[in-house]
Amino acid sequence: MKRLSLLIFGLILSTTVPVMAADCPALVKQALASTDALCNETGQNQACYGNINLTARTNASVENFRFSQPGDRTDISNIKSLQLSPMALDRGEWGVALMKVQANSPTSKPADLTLLAFGDVTLENDVPSPTTMDVQVVGQKAINIRSLPNMKAGVVGSLKPNQTVSAFERVSDGSWLRVKLPTSDQMGWVSTDYMSGAGDIRTLNIVDGIQPHYQPMQAFTFKSGSEKQTCAEVPQDGLIIQTPEGSGEVQLWINQVVVKLGSTVYFQAQPSGDMVVTTVEGHATVEARGVSYTAVAGSSIHVKLDADMNPISAPSLPQAYQMVDVANLPIAHLPRKISIHMPLAQTEINTLQQTQPANTTTNSNNNNNGSGNNKPKCPGNSCHNGTNNNNGNGDVDKKDKDKDKHKHKNG
C-alpha cells in the first residue's frame, strides 16, 4: 500500500509540473532570472544565450561556434542571425538573448549598449565580417586624421612619423583609409599618399565615407512577432535597447532606418507592417526617407515597412503610447535603473515637437538612406566587401591626389 501511495503521489507530481510550467508570469520570471544569472559576465561585443530557445546562424568564416544552450556566450561578430522562440507554455520556452554592443558614440569613453531581446524576435547582423590591416606613416612628418575622406574635413587626431595604426575600410578608389585613432575607439580618415602597408588595401571593405563606422550589431534587420500574448502580464515580443550612463547620443541603423538614442527604447517591427519606436525614458530620433522626428519619453514613432523590412514611408509624427503596451517591459533586468514614463498627452507632444529643429534632412536622401529605387544594400559603411568593388582590377587611382600632396601636412 505504501509503495502504491508513493506511485500515485509521483504521478500527481509529474502532472502538476507541466501545469506550473504553463503559468505565464512564472515562466517569464524564471526566464529573466536565468538570463540575469547566466549572462551577468557578458563582455563588450558579446551575445549571451539567456533562455530557450535560440537559434543562431554564423558567418561563413567562423569555426568551432558554440551557442546552443543557456549561458553560452560568443562574440557578436560571429553571428549572422539570431532567432528567438515565441512563448510555448507546453515546452516551457520563451527565448531571451542579451547583447552588449559597443556604443557608436562620439565620446572616447568606452561604453556598452545593452540589447535585451525576448519572445518571437529575429535579428540579422547587417555589418559584414570586419576587415583590417596595419598601415604605417610614411616620411618624417606627422599627419592629420580627418573626420571625412577629404582634405577640407575637420581634424580629429594625428599620427607621428612611422607610427602604425589599424585600417578597417577604404573609399572605392583607395585614396583614403578609415583608421582607428591610437588613443581611443574613435575612427578617422587618412590619405594613402602618406601611408604604406604590407597587405593589399583592396581586401578592406569599401565604404562611402559619409556614414559613421558601424560595428557588428550596430546595424541590423529586426522583426518581432505580431500575435498578442494571452497573458496580460507578459510583454509583447520585442527588443529593448538602453544606452549607458554618460554616453551621449548613440546612432544605430535598424531596418535601414537611422535611430539616434540616448535613452531606453522599446522596438517592435513586422513585415508589411510598422516598426514602432517607443521611448520609455530619454529620447530617440528616427530618420527615414529624408525626414526625422524625435520621440521623447512617453511617446512613440511608427515607420511603415515593406515585406523585406525596408522603410516605405517617412516616420510618423510622435504619438502617445498606451501604458498597457509598456507596463510589463522587463526594465528591472537592465543595467541602468529607470522608471517607465507615463504616456504624454498628445497636446504636450505636439508642443514639444514644435520646439524641435526642422525635421527634414539631406543626409538620408544624399546617402540613399531610404527605400525603393534608391534603397541602400548596406548600412552606409559596408556597401562592398573587399575586392568586390567593380573597380576594374582594383588598382588605386591617384590621378587627382598629387595636386595637394605638397600643400598639406596630410591636409
Q: Where in this protein do the model-derived segments appear?
A:
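Extracellular secreted precursors and ectodomains with disulfide-bonded cysteine-rich loops/domains
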Residues: 22, 37, 46, 229, ...
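SH3-family beta-barrel domains
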Residues: 22-62, 66, 115-147, 157-164, ...
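Short, polar/charged, low-complexity connector loops/linkers at domain or secondary-structure junctions
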Residues: 285-350
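Bacterial N-terminal signal peptides that target proteins for export
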Residues: 1-7
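Ser/Thr/Gly/Pro-rich low-complexity, disordered linker/stalk segments of secreted
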Residues: 335-411
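SH3/SH3-like beta-barrel superfamily modules
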Residues: 155-199, 285-288, 293-296, 301-304
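N-terminal signal peptide c-region/cleavage motif recognized by signal peptidases
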Residues: 14-16
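Short, small/hydrophobic-biased targeting/export segments
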Residues: 226-301
